[in-house]
Structure formats: C-alpha cells, structure tokens
Amino acid sequence: MPSGSMSGGVSGPTSPPHPTVPSRPLRPSRYVPVSAATAFLVGSTTLFFCFTCPWLSEQFSVAVPIYNGVMFMFVLANFCMATFMDPGIFPRAEEDEDKEDDFRAPLYKTVEIRGIQVRMKWCSTCRFYRPPRCSHCSVCDNCVEDFDHHCPWVNNCIGRRNYRYFFLFLLSLTAHIMGVFGFGLLFILYHTQQLDRVHSAVTMAVMCVAGLFFIPVAGLTGFHVVLVARGRTTNEQVTGKFRGGVNPFTNGCLRNVSHVLCSSQAPRYLGRKRKAQTVSVQPPFLRPQLTEAQLAAKVLDNGIQGDLHRSKSSLEMMESQSADAEPPPPPKPELRYPGLSRGPAGHSEESSLLNKAPPTPTMFKYRPTYSSPGKNHTALTHAYANQSSQQPGYRSEPSLDGREGGGAERSGAERTGGGPGGPPGSGIPGYSLGGRSYPSFSDPTVLAERASRSSSVRSTHNAPPSEATTSTSYKSLANQTPPQAARNGSLSYDSLLTPSESPDFESAAPEMSPGRPRTPVVGYSSPFLSAQIAHQREAELHQPVASSSALMASPQHAVFLRGSGSPPVPPERERERLLHDSQAQHHHHHHHHHHHHRPPRFSRPPLLSDSGPPQPSYPYRTRSTDTTHPPRSPHPPPLGKSLSYSSAAAAEMQYRLVRKASASVAGGGIQAPKDEIQMKSYSRTNGQPKPSSTPSSPTHPISVSTRPGQAHSSAGSSQSPAHKPGGGVKKVTGVGGTTYEISV
C-alpha cells in the first residue's frame, strides 16, 4: 500500500537512504476502507462480467462487454494511481537547515499573488513555511503541495500530483457504476419470469451494490466538478478561504479544467537520487566562502527580499551616522538683501563676508539645548542664527571705534588670526575648544584696551551668533513667520520692546547713511535706535549742552558713522571715559537691585547662548573666573562666555546706560513717564507700526537672568519713581485682547 511507497526521503552523502520521511506505524484500521472499496469495485465488476455480460453480448452487441471492460480498467487504473502515487509531499527540513529559523520564525508569512495577500503558515513538524495551498496532513503526517483532502477510500492524500487521477477516478467510477446498473437493469427486465435463477439473482445483487455506491460517488463527483471549474481545492472550499473574496489561483473555467486534466505532471520531491557532494576542506577547517549569488538575497519574514551582506563603506557610513548625534544643518540661506548697496572701497570685505555661507561651528555640539518652564522649543542651529547676525551695518552690533580708527587694527587682527576663527595673534592669552580659539582676558587692563577691537572683529567674522541675534532668529523661527510677513503680523512682545521697526527709524537710518537706499531691510535684527532720533529726543526732553556732544560720540553713533563712511571718530580718552562712566553707572544699578530678586513675570525662553551662569549686561564679555569684585571696580568682572559669544544686547545696555547718565545730569527723574509713553506709542495696530507724535526716550532695558526664579532689572531706582525696590508690572493690551505683563 502507499505506506511503503511513500517512506522515501532525501538522502545525503553519508545519511540513510530515506531520512526525511519517518516510517509510519502499521495500523490495520487504515486499510479497512480501501480494502472494502477495492473488494466492492473488483468483486461487483467481476460478477457483472461473469453473469450478465454474456447474455448482453449475445442479445445486443459485443460492444457492451467491451465498453464495460474498458471503463472498469480505466477506473481501476485511476484508483491505483490515486492510491499509490505520491501526492506531492514536501521533504522535511534537516536540522542544519532550520536551526536559524526555527526559534525566531514568526507564525505566518504573507506573500502577494496577483495582488492578493496569501498567508503562509509555519509548519512546526516539517520546520518550514508551507507554500500557498499547501497543508499538513494529520493522517499522513506530511506537508502536501496543493493539498485537497485525505481520502480514506484510497488511503492516500489527494494533492497536486494525484488529484488528476482522483478526479478521473470519480468520473470513471460514476460512469462505470451507471453502466453496470443500467445493463443489469436491462438484464432483469428481460428475465422477469426467471428471477429465481442464479444469473438473475447475481445481477440484482450487483445492481444493489452499484446503486448503493452511486449516490455518494455521484455526489462527490459533482462536488469536485464544481471545484475544478472554480479552481479551488476541497481544503479551501471547506475552510472558506476565498468565500468572501477573489481566488488568486483561478484562471477561468476552461483553463482550470484543462490545467487539471491536461497539464504536465508535477515533479516529485521525495526519492530523488542525489549525487554525493565533495567538499574540499581548507587547512583552517573553515567553511568555503559563499559566492555573491548565494549571498544575493533572502526572503525575510514578511516575504520581502532583503540583502544579507553590506559593503564595508555602507557599514562605516551607518556607524558614523549613528555615532553623530548632531542634527544635519539646514540648507544654506542665500544672503541677498534687496536694495542693499555697499560702498565700492570701504565695504568690499564686509560684502564678501556677507556672501559667504555661514558655517556651523563646532561649539554647537557642546552647548546644551535651552529649556523653558512652560514650553519646549526646537534647538536652533548656528547656520540659521548666523543669517540674522550677517545683517547690514546700521543694524549690526555697535562698535566703539570708527572706520579709520579701527580699520588698521582690525585688519591686523584678522591677518594675525585674532578673530574667533583663528588663534589669538594679538598678544591676548586665550584657550582653544573644538578647533576655535577664544581669548581669556584675565588682566583688567587688557579688557578696556581690547573692547572696541572685539566688537569690530566680531561684526566682520563668521563667528558663532550673539545673544541678541540668536534671540531674534529664534523668535522668527519659533513663530514660523517669513521676514516679509513679519511686518504684517499680529502684536508681539518684540514689537512692544523694539521701537526700531517704526517708520521714524526706517526713515532716519538712510539719512545717517546716504549711500544706502530707503528700502527697509527685510528680517529681524538687533533693536537699536538711530543716533539722530536719540539726539533729537534728548534735545527735546532735556536740552543738554554737554550731553549732546557726548551722545554723538556714543557707540551707536559710531556704528552709523561706520555704515555711512563718515570720518568723525571719538578720541581714545573720551571713549575710555564713556566706558568707565557706563560701567560705574551699571555697577550702581546692579548692586542696588541685588537684594530684590523675583521670578520674571514675562520673559523670553532661554536660548542656546543663555545657558550657563547669569550674565549681567556689559559692553563686552570675557571668560568667567568666578571671582568677587568690589562694587566700585573700574573694570567689570569677567563673565561666563567667550568674546565671540558676546551679545548685541550688552552693547544696547551700554548705550542706554550712557543715555541715562546724561539724562540724570540734565533732567532728573522724568524718564519713567516717557518710557510709558514710548512703550505704548510704538505698539502695533493690525500688524502695522503706529508712531507717536510725542518724542520719548528709549525703553528701559529688561535684562533676564537665566537662573530659574531670578531676574535682574537693569534700571536704577534713582532714575524713575517707577523703579522702586518692590518693582512693578506694566500691562499692555494688544490686538485681540492679548494682555502682556512686563516686569520693570
């Protein structure tokens, strides 16, 4: 029977002949149905030929026994083929084949056949993923290709290789049963008077057997005719795999029938004689190297082919990408300013620097990201922040030296590499971090001597961005507002504290620099008042005689003189005196408010350049030495940032302190009411700046401490009654009912 014929397997070079299919135990009950079917088929047909066919051949034709004989032989042949033929058993995986897939393999794999997802299940017995339409027979204990069902009447599984014979067996058996029953009925009709005879009794017995088997066989035949026409198997029909969808294996009725009856025989996977493989073992006893074709692709768990080997360069690139935690820099901005014209002689160096793409400094990966008490902001790269720091001269950082006075000194510092991008070549001791050199400024005498040079060098180099430029670029990035649309935006805290966006400032800037057109500059920049507006307001408020000349020598005036190419430069002594006065005045304010710390009521989020210890606003910044100093020290204490990271807000603070010093000499305490007028007059209405007819002084600077819970007010209590030790809060209502509370 089929048990002996199906015990073959795949034989290795030194393995037993059939190791893949284990020998099944002999169970007599398995052979009962097939034995009964064989007995009824052969016995009834033999009786029919012995007792009925001779009379039929004599009375009607010799073709009757010939027809029945051919049909019986066809039935018997198909029965034997369906019983003894291999249905398409897949050999089981050997141990060395499935050891890498058995434990980590998922339960299912999904493949796509004609656009339809078909699931392949993992067979734990055979240890491989069963192909589509394959199933494991529980009786035969084998995975059968195109499994239809296990037929007990033939004692074999019906699969791809023997389904044709099983189907033909059903068809021929049905026809044979009908022929036997019909010809037997014909014999009885002619011998109704002789029913007691042996021939009539045997013929009626054969008719009873044929009639008994005709109903189930005819029903099974009709069922399989439908399955063949629809291109399905019994297993698919019973389990209902394609009951509510489309069968991807059907090719139409005619093609399905022709595929079952006329297709070529499927190959057999068991019992193949394989040649012995000779493997040459090398001296280190290593496995032979696999070829590229063997390593080309492997079907992954989801059915997708993936490459198993990667080149060395791709692995190194993946390792470098995983090791580098710094995000990639944004695309380089095209630094073009509409309507910006530079002088042909004095501005060639700055124009070339503006056209260069801002580099991403190495210090960025060592600087911590900023955090806010209530918000989480995206980290800002220096490539984006440098865009706002490379603004035109009349909006860039202030400098204490003029074009003529500092030109040679700055060019000498650039040649010797004294800028932030090179080593300190001007005789200033410094330190190096991340490939960049930074001066340390431990001598107080060097501090005052190098202050003006630092501002000019810093404004012309591609240094890391300052605090003010980082603040403005951070705000523009956080608001996601382009520079053109920012002019028409809603009321913001920047417009309240930045009077530089008013029409007066836009019109006054070209007057101070006649070489530039009147086109307003696009984008945010450091909020500074022009020197001319400051001079007019100071004259209207206090009419000082001495302070006007002092204000014209202020650092902000020096910036506009540099931008317009004007020759007047404050002398060295006057500049040192202004530095000394502003520092002493700021020391007075700083120590006066030292014991009145309170949490900021309205402050901007800390930036990348704000991380570290709290920094009072000074005209320049040096490296921190963490040493205490007397309140009346002629030089300010060093701070926790290098020279290249000094901010424009510090220069703005110096400029306002010089203004306050001159205002305190001339006018006294009338500045606070004007501050409130100025604060409200430069607010925006419907996105447009609204100038005020009343001239006012600059706003009080609000210096925000980076320590949580502390804020230092930089305005002294002697300047205005609004700046008392207890402090106060200004409330400004904007468009849409938004109320801004500003700590002063």
Curated annotation (Swiss-Prot):
Kindly provide the name given to this protein in its UniProt entry: Palmitoyltransferase ZDHHC5-A
| Localization, UniProt | Cell membrane
Of which family is this protein a member?
Answer: Belongs to the DHHC palmitoyltransferase family. ERF2/ZDHHC9 subfamily.
Q: Where is the composition biased (Basic and acidic residues)?
A: 398-413, 571-584
- Gene for this protein? zdhhc5a
Q: Which residues form the active site?
A: C151
| Source organism (scientific name) | Danio rerio
This protein's UniProt keywords:
Acyltransferase, Cell membrane, Lipoprotein, Membrane, Methylation, Palmitate, Phosphoprotein, Transferase, Transmembrane, Transmembrane helix
Q: Where is the composition biased (Low complexity)?
A: 621-630, 689-723
Write down the top EC class of this protein: transferase
Name the lineage. Eukaryota, Metazoa, Chordata, Craniata, Vertebrata
GO biological process terms on file = positive regulation of pattern recognition receptor signaling pathway
Fill in the domain comment.
The DHHC domain is required for palmitoyltransferase activity.
